[in-house]
Every structure is written in structure tokens, then in C-alpha cells.
UniProtKB/Swiss-Prot annotation:
Pathway in which the depicted protein is active: Cofactor biosynthesis; NAD(+) biosynthesis; NAD(+) from deamido-NAD(+) (ammonia route): step 1/1
Binding residues annotated for Mg(2+), in chain numbering: D42, E143
Residues that bind ATP: G36, L37, S38, G39, G40, I41, D42, S43, T138, K167, S189
Coiled coil: none
Stated name of the protein: NH(3)-dependent NAD(+) synthetase
Reactions mediated catalytically: deamido-NAD(+) + NH4(+) + ATP = AMP + diphosphate + NAD(+) + H(+)
Family to which the UniProt record says this protein belongs: Belongs to the NAD synthetase family.
MF GO annotations: ATP binding; glutaminase activity; metal ion binding; NAD+ synthase (glutamine-hydrolyzing) activity; NAD+ synthase activity
Name of the gene this protein is made from: nadE
The protein's role, per its UniProt record: Catalyzes the ATP-dependent amidation of deamido-NAD to form NAD. Uses ammonia as a nitrogen source.
Gene Ontology CC: cytoplasm
Enzyme Commission designation: 6.3.1.5
Length: 277
């Protein structure tokens, strides 16, 4: 397996994702979106797609830095705001996050990171309610499969155009869309603390894990066949465990089924019956 095996027809993909945003937002009865613009590639791609699908007047970018956030990240977010000519607001999370952090030891970075992600989502959904817009998500397929995200934090959204794209494919789409290379080529980071990077947290690169996930999920290859492709047993076992262990993050809260028509189980598609008016 080679990285190019994950390549897609990115022109067709762009059309599909623009139609997805237009149709889903219309079905919900809305016309605009708000998203957190971090300065990273995922949020840049979602912002670009939203503008092409809805128009710049229907897209609001929220910058939500913490006091230790990378200055480079803010500059890259501003670069996309200027490129797309979209409205933007800066809402620092420092005061709210620091209130929580008083009770969280500095060494407990996972807890602090989850608090930061959920604080940002509180701001996004408050702006969504204020403006009557929908929150557009930016989590990609790799993150969702590995559980590399915060429930009701960065994983929360109303619509997510990237959820079925591996990180490698997001990069390919970004190049097709003309996203500045400085955003595409930099080390991915959730900007949760100074010097944080996704790949150092995970212990492997997106390129490596995307190929493994593709063989596991899309090709449905057995363990021995994947090991025959040169994947180490320890890497395979670790990634499989992450995918299985984090299944709960990919589901809405599990409901105890009592009746014959249970929300999310038997009764799922009400909003598709007709347009909301």
C-alpha cells in the first residue's frame, strides 16, 4: 500500500461536499454556519467549502485562542479570513478555562485539553443560538476512528463535511482547493497547550495510520494480511484497540429501548420528510 492509494477525485469530492452542505443546512431550515477557525488545515478546508457552498456572507469564523496558543495559528486563521473575505470574531477562552484549571493539576493535560475543547464548543453553540446558524464540524475520519477528540467538545457539530475523509485525503482536498501550503505542510495541532502536536500525542504519523486504517476498514483485510504489508504487530494491535475502545465516541448517547418507536433507533428521519419552514 502506498499513500497515493488513498487519492480521490478531488474535483468530484468538492462538488459532493458543497451539495452536502447546501442540502443538509436547508433541511435543517438554516442558511448559515459558524465554525471554529484554528489556523489548521481541517478548519481551513471546512471554511473554504462552506464559502463555496453558501457564500461568504453565510459563514462566520470564530477564533478562540488560549493565552498559550500559538501566534502562528492565529496568523494562519487570519490568512484564511482574508482569503475568503468572511466575517470573524475573536473570543478568547482564557478566562473560562482558567476558572476550571484552578481545580485541575497542571500535569493533567488530558483533562485540561478536554476542558479547553468543551469551552470552545460552548462559545460556538452560543454564537449559533445568537445568530440562528449551524455549527460546522471539522473532525476528520482518522480522528473519529481513533477517538482523538473530545466528546461534546471539538467532536460536536450539526454538520461535518470531513468525517468520512482520512487526514491524508483532507490534505489532498486542501491542495485541490488552493489552501495556502503553509497550512497544509505544518505539523497538525489542536493547540491545546504550548508545543502540542497531534502526531507526538498519538505516537505515529497520520500517513502511517491512514494506510493501516484504510486496509482495516475499506479493504477489510485480516490481521495477517496487513502484517504482510510491512505493518508491525504492535502498531496494528494498538490502532485496532483505539478504534474498538472509542466506538462510544462515535455514537449518540445509547438509549434504553422501551417502545416500538425509539428516537435514533426506529425513528430517525423526521427532518427528511419535508423541508422545515
Amino acid at each position: 500500500m502506498q499513500p497515493q492509494d488513498l487519492d480521490l477525485n478531488y474535483g468530484l469530492l468538492e462538488d459532493i461536499l458543497k451539495a452536502f452542505l447546501q442540502n443538509e443546512i436547508r433541511k435543517f431550515g438554516f442558511s448559515s454556519v459558524v465554525l471554529g477557525l484554528s489556523g489548521g488545515i481541517d478548519s481551513a478546508v471546512v471554511a473554504e467549502l462552506a464559502v463555496r457552498a453558501l457564500g461568504p456572507e453565510h459563514v462566520l469564523a470564530l477564533k478562540m485562542p488560549y493565552k498559550e496558543s500559538s501566534r502562528e495559528s492565529l496568523e494562519h486563521a487570519d490568512l484564511m479570513i482574508r482569503r475568503l473575505n468572511i466575517k470573524a470574531e475573536e473570543r478568547p477562552v482564557t478566562p473560562m478555562a482558567d476558572d476550571f484549571f484552578r481545580d485541575v493539576p497542571e500535569g493533567e493535560r488530558l483533562r485540561r485539553g478536554n476542558i479547553m475543547a468543551r469551552t470552545r464548543m460552548v462559545l460556538l453553540y452560543d454564537v449559533s443560538a445568537r445568530d440562528g446558524s449551524l455549527v460546522a464540524g471539522t473532525s476528520n475520519k482518522t480522528e473519529l476512528l481513533l477517538g482523538y477528540g473530545t466528546m461534546f467538545g471539538d467532536m460536536a457539530s450539526a454538520v461535518n463535511p470531513l468525517g468520512d475523509l482520512y487526514k491524508t485525503q483532507v490534505r489532498g482536498l486542501a491542495r485541490h482547493l488552493g489552501i495556502p501550503s503553509i497550512l497544509i505542510d505544518k505539523a497538525p495541532s489542536a493547540d491545546l497547550w504550548e508545543g502540542q502536536s497531534d502526531e507526538s500525542d498519538l505516537g505515529f504519523s497520520y500517513g502511517e495510520v491512514d494506510l493501516l486504517l484504510y486496509m482495516m476498514l475499506e479493504l477489510r483485510m485480516e490481521r495477517e494480511a496487513i502484517l504482510g504489508e510491512g505493518v508491525s504487530a504492535s502498531f496494528y494491535d494498538r490502532v485496532r484497540k483505539m478504534v474498538v475502545r472509542n466506538q462510544y465516541k462515535r455514537l449518540m448517547p445509547v438509549i434504553a429501548k422501551i417502545s416500538g418507536r425509539t428516537p435514533g433507533i426506529d425513528f430517525r428521519y423526521a427532518r427528511d420528510w419535508q423541508e422545515v419552514r
